[in-house]
């Protein structure tokens, strides 16, 4: 089944919904970083949140970066997304292992930790990016984003993010949704939506059963005039390039470049997001040095 993100409304626009199946892109990210099951679940939840939230950006050059680090053994996760539903991410320690939690599930909250902040950074092409932050609520990620939307953006929200890791470490199912009540929605509607969300099986169960994201949302919002606005296929996509890495290397300054050149060895730089290796020979470093002197 292809991954898909859809945006929708219910009850004449009183409820705003972004939902998606992200199994393939989470599998891609997990493979790139060689994640353990709990690392795959944590990274996958963040990637899913990123691609869902990224679709709310208006322009192609706008970017959304999400960061969470609660002091746990996962050592933090960062993801970056764009409005075309592309997303990339990395986890500080992809080899983290934890015992199952008291519910018999992967202990994502324990791996992330609670002693830290969740950051939402929106680069909208202005002089300064918008930076929102909240204390980590549970480390389970979905609850943390629900807390962020409610506290930082004053939008009561329900967030579900799920990743089901198979025995062979591939991703069996991944997906999620963000449901937000508009300011003029009445309390009875909010109570009904909350009740529905509490009664449904985990989203990974529904995906594993072969249900599409449309079927899942129609199941949740039955009788609420679900209106699907648009859809897009999300992708794990890194936009690194040799040119960008070269610019970053040049920016470290003439003295540091001279030290690398004097060392007489090739310099290898690895992209955090996709593990692509870029090698710069002493000749390459020499050219960068000469360019820096010209400037």
Swiss-Prot record:
Pfam families for this protein: HSP33
GO CC, any one term: cytoplasm
Posttranslational mods: Under oxidizing conditions two disulfide bonds are formed involving the reactive cysteines. Under reducing conditions zinc is bound to the reactive cysteines and the protein is inactive.
Cystine pairs: 238-240, 271-274
Keyword line: Chaperone, Cytoplasm, Disulfide bond, Redox-active center, Zinc
Subcellular localization: Cytoplasm
Keyword Zinc listed: yes
One Gene Ontology molecular-function label: protein folding chaperone
Classification via Gene3D superfamilies: Hsp33 domain (3.55.30.10), HSP33 redox switch-like (3.90.1280.10)
Chief place of localization: cytoplasm
Keyword rRNA-binding: no
GO annotation (BP), single: protein refolding
Matches recorded under NCBIfam families: PRK00114.1
Family: Belongs to the HSP33 family.
Function of the protein: Redox regulated molecular chaperone. Protects both thermally unfolding and oxidatively damaged proteins from irreversible aggregation. Plays an important role in the bacterial defense system toward oxidative stress.
Name of the molecule in the record: 33 kDa chaperonin
